[in-house]
């Protein structure tokens, strides 16, 4: 987790005792603003949120003991005011050994389930009976790179959008048990694999693959992404004065925010270019 708080401007905090001192200070100075929620098992959970710039902050969380002692369990970064990424079906589960919640999003645009760290767990605890209407996705990156865009004509862009929409519809039909849809998807995948195998012999992979969203490593909420840069904001951590970039990325037709320390991004980010990096994926749920 220490690798990812550098993405919000804490790159000098590399040792556990340094991070502990930072968390102690934030908890001590902001204890009056602590939010407390009670779970259905009568467990009292708390969190303290410290805004560090216009868009990012650090959340410290834990549980209350019987005598009112605040026991800290962990911390995570967050991004505020991100846009809706998906309105697909989403489920939330609590981890067995701590008060961390994860979400699973079934979005057919990706053709797989996305697992993310829930960024607003107390909202969920206070409103468990309310339906989840949408999810705002955002991630944190400690090492990113800017890629040039793939040159496309307007016809190619429209054709790509249509193929993506058709594939989404086929996946929806396949989930309902449509045999024709399953056969079509299988044939398309085989054809795509054959085409890529031929092209990869003479072309760079990032000149073939426009955007990418796939699991990375052993953690289930870490993803490797390649996406188009739609917007860029530069901000400053008020505690460390480190520069932070907040990128709005479109990846496989899904929009999400990505925070990265400015010095950790190789290349000059501009709208229209692409971003490549491994992100720790978080999500804020919106409820009806």
Predicted regions and their residues:
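N-terminal alpha-helical "arm" segments
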Residues: 1-43
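Long, hydrophobic alpha/beta structural blocks
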Residues: 40-217
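Short amphipathic beta-strand/extended segments with alternating polar/hydrophobic composition
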Residues: 113-117, 256-262
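Eukaryotic intrinsically disordered and solvent-exposed regulatory patches
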Residues: 214, 233-235, 263
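Short coil-to-beta-strand transition motifs
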Residues: 216-228, 273
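OB-fold (S1/OB) nucleic-acid-binding surfaces
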Residues: 230-258
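Short nucleic-acid-contacting surface segments enriched for D/E, G, S/T with interspersed K/R
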Residues: 262-277
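Short, Lys/Arg- and Gly-enriched loop/turn segments at beta-strand edges
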Residues: 280-288
């Amino acid at each position: 987790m220490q690798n990812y708080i550098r993405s919000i401007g804490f790159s000098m905090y590399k040792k556990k005792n340094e991070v502990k001192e930072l968390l102690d200070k934030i908890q001590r100075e902001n204890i009056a603003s602590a939010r407390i929620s009670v779970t259905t098992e009568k467990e009292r959970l708390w969190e303290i949120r410290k805004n560090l710039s216009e868009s990012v902050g650090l959340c410290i969380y834990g549980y209350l003991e019987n005598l009112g002692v605040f026991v800290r369990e962990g911390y995570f970064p967050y991004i505020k005011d991100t846009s809706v990424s998906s309105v697909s079906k989403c489920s939330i589960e609590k981890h067995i050994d701590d008060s961390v919640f994860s979400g699973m999003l079934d979005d057919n645009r990706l053709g797989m389930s996305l697992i993310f760290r829930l960024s607003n767990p107390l909202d969920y605890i206070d409103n468990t009976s309310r339906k989840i209407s949408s999810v705002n996705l955002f991630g944190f990156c400690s090492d990113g790179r800017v890629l040039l865009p793939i040159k496309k004509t307007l016809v190619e862009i429209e054709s790509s959008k249509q193929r993506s929409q058709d594939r989404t519809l086929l996946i929806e039909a396949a989930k309902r048990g449509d045999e024709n849809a399953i056969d079509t998807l299988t044939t398309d995948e085989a054809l795509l694999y054959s085409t890529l195998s031929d092209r990869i012999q003479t072309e760079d992979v990032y000149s073939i693959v426009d955007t990418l969203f796939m699991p990375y490593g052993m953690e289930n909420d870490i993803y490797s992404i390649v996406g188009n840069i739609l917007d860029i904001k530069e901000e400053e951590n008020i505690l460390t004065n480190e520069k932070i970039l907040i990128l709005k990325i479109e990846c496989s037709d899904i929009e999400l925010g990505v925070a990265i320390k400015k010095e950790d991004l190789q290349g000059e980010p501009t709208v229209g270019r692409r971003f490549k990096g491994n992100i720790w994926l978080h999500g804020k749920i919106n409820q009806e």
